[in-house]
Design a protein with these regions (language model features):
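Acidic/histidine-rich catalytic cores of soluble enzymes
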Residues: 156-241
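A short mid-domain helix/strand-loop element embedded in enzyme catalytic domains
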Residues: 105, 139-152, 185-188
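N-terminal pre-domain/capping segments
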Residues: 1-139, 144, 174, 223-225
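Buried hydrophobic side chains on well-structured beta-strands
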Residues: 54, 147, 191-193
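Short, flexible helix-coil linker/hinge segments at the edges of structured domains or between repeats
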Residues: 106-120, 145, 151-169
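Active-site beta-loop-alpha junctions enriched in small/polar residues
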Residues: 15-17, 58-61, 102-105, 150-152, ...
């Protein structure tokens, strides 16, 4: 089902406001603001009638420590406290979270892929990180979860395990809906698959919207729950479509 809010609502994501103005060709030109300061800026924008919604990667909000995959559940942890402080600020501004997405590209652990990493232990770690992201989204009342292909791709065709790699991806995405059901998260109205033809990998496993639709309809357990985030002016534009 098409969600008109994705085009009707004005939104500004955490990662745009927090960007230190770096790019692949040069480093940051200003310090990255703290996530709580970003939340305050976004809440102020909402109060001034400039935006209605925001979105975030899990790593935009709090740091991730693979040694403590459930720190968001520990009332004594800084992550637990930070998330609730962010939630309070956003609520005071009347700002809603439209979408959360799990960063499976920022850590060097996932250089060879997140959900499709050839190392089963790293795939399992990626799944734990996705679970944490879904819990964060539940806390903040996110409407959607988005999977971006990120590092799930390849550079060398001959070294890629095509006999299994799409099975691993399906397993990872089916785990999303399975975990939402297991935890009885009712805030999520759906999830989306966000394709990209290349970057940061040489080639992606889900390069276009057509590939995304085909994968959803043929490989996922609950296709009706999934949609496509086409990034028409960004990722899809890279394919010259």
């Amino acid at each position: 089902m098409f969600d008109t809010m994705c085009v009707a609502a004005r939104s500004m994501p955490f990662w745009c406001v927090a960007n230190p103005l770096s790019d692949p060709f040069g480093g940051a030109v200003q310090p990255a603001p703290d996530a709580l300061d970003v939340a305050r800026m976004l809440a102020k924008a909402a109060k001034n009638g400039l935006i209605e919604m925001t979105s975030a990667h899990d790593d935009d909000l709090v740091p991730w420590d693979p040694a403590h995959p459930e720190d968001d559940l520990d009332p004594k942890s800084d992550v637990y406290k930070k998330l609730r402080a962010i939630k309070k600020v956003l609520a005071q501004g009347g700002l809603k979270i439209n979408m959360v997405t799990c960063s499976l590209h920022g850590s060097t652990l996932f250089r060879a892929g997140g959900l499709t990493n050839p190392d089963a232990k790293l795939r399992a770690l990626a799944a734990r990180k996705v679970e944490r992201c879904l819990r964060i989204g539940h806390l903040l009342g996110a409407k959607h979860y988005t999977y971006w292909v990120a590092r799930d791709g390849f550079e060398v065709y001959e070294k890629t395990d095509f006999a299994h790699i799409y099975d691993w991806l399906a397993e990872g995405l089916n785990h999303v809906t399975g975990y939402i059901e297991k935890m009885k998260f009712t805030n999520y109205k759906g999830a989306t698959l966000e394709p990209k033809p290349n970057e940061p990998r040489g080639a992606m496993l889900i390069p276009t919207s057509g590939h995304a639709v085909g994968f959803i309809m043929t490989r996922l357990n609950k296709p009706a729950f999934w949609g496509v985030n086409p990034e028409l002016l960004q990722h899809e534009g890279m394919t010259l479509l």
